[in-house]
């Protein structure tokens, strides 16, 4: 995993890492992804998670939560959310956006997450079922099972909160928006042939057409 640049963020955290795991409070899915992080099909393998962002003095009153759905086809952040409460609504909102953006394909989508309470919730599961999406979950306390999204969270924090002294939520919210736009549209990746995620998606669709 280290050679692929996929690292967990827990090893460098000075404050306690956010953990959405509350035990078995709903339905736990098997690990369908099994660390197979590559695909040549867009919208086939999606990974998601929640992380915490803090500013100023980094107290519990100076924190927000961020979640994203990443397509492993090109590493693009398809949908995301930032807010103060990492509840089920917080997760369902970008999930519904993802479903709305999803093109018609001949294959089924798999969405992989950890075992956080939001992903065990019936509302989340029902959205997946109604859209014929496979659910996949990491094993407990095994961040490498979801290494791609963990790695992105590290990059996001280095590009925002770790190197800036934000004074309030609005400042960090704007910084996150700008970073995601940069990451999707301009940050080139060697494995994408020196293209950004969006460039790769457009280039690939033009080749197929």
What are these model-predicted stretches?
Residues 76, 104-109:
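Short, surface-exposed connector motifs at secondary-structure boundaries
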Residues 62, 81-105:
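Active-site beta-loop-alpha junctions of metal-dependent nucleic acid enzymes
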Residues 129-133, 155-209:
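C-terminal domain-tail junction helix/linker
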């Amino acid at each position: 995993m280290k050679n692929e640049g996929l690292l967990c963020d827990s090893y460098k955290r000075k404050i306690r890492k956010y953990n959405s795991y509350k035990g078995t409070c709903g339905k736990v899915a098997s690990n369908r992804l099994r660390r197979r992080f590559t695909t040549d099909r867009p919208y086939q393998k999606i990974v998601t998670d929640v992380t915490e962002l803090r500013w100023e003095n980094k107290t519990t009153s100076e924190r927000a939560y961020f979640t994203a759905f990443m397509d492993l086809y090109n590493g693009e952040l398809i949908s995301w959310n930032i807010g103060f409460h990492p509840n089920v609504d917080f997760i369902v909102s970008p999930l519904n956006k993802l479903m709305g953006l999803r093109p018609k394909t001949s294959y089924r989508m798999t969405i992989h997450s950890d075992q956080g309470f939001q992903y065990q919730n019936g509302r989340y599961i029902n959205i997946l079922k109604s859209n014929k999406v496979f659910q996949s979950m990491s094993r407990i306390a095994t961040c490498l099972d979801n290494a791609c999204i963990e790695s992105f969270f590290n990059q996001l924090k280095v590009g925002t909160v770790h190197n800036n002294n934000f004074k309030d939520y609005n400042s960090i919210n704007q910084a996150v928006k700008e970073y995601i736009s940069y990451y999707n549209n301009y940050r080139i990746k060697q494995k994408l042939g020196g293209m950004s995620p969006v460039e790769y998606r457009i280039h690939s669709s033009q080749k197929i057409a």
